[in-house]
Amino acid sequence: MGHAIVVALFLHLLGVAIWIGGMIFAHFCLRPALEDLSPQLRLPLWESVFGRFFNWVGVSVIVILLTGGFLLMQFGGGHASWPLHAMAGIGVLMMLIFGHIRFALFPRVRRAVQAQRWPDGARAVGTVRRLVVVNTVLGIVTIGVAVMSRGF
């Protein structure tokens, strides 16, 4: 395996770890810890967390796209094995879901917090939560496909 492939794989997996790990932390650790807070405290905190986390995910998505495309080409391109195509397809779906969260739902959260419309903000955060669960499941499935495709 050449150095370029090793570096690309490292960066790819780092991006995946940041994205999936962040979603797992947010859903299973942060969300339950914030449940007892009033909406006036909880929603501005979510807005702040989302703002920071989505920047990290945005960088991760770019890194994953670039390195994933490079790796796919190195391992056969259109003739690559089905697990590589499955990972690419699921990854693109996850990126589209993230795009919807970042560019459609997050602005709703931000507007609701700025206007102190707590029910609107809570609805938007609830939709983000459900889509994060979907993306987490898709990410775990993708990791499973990656492990199974290695032929250990």
Predicted regions and their residues:
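Polytopic transmembrane helical bundles with strong interfacial aromatic enrichment
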Residues: 1-152
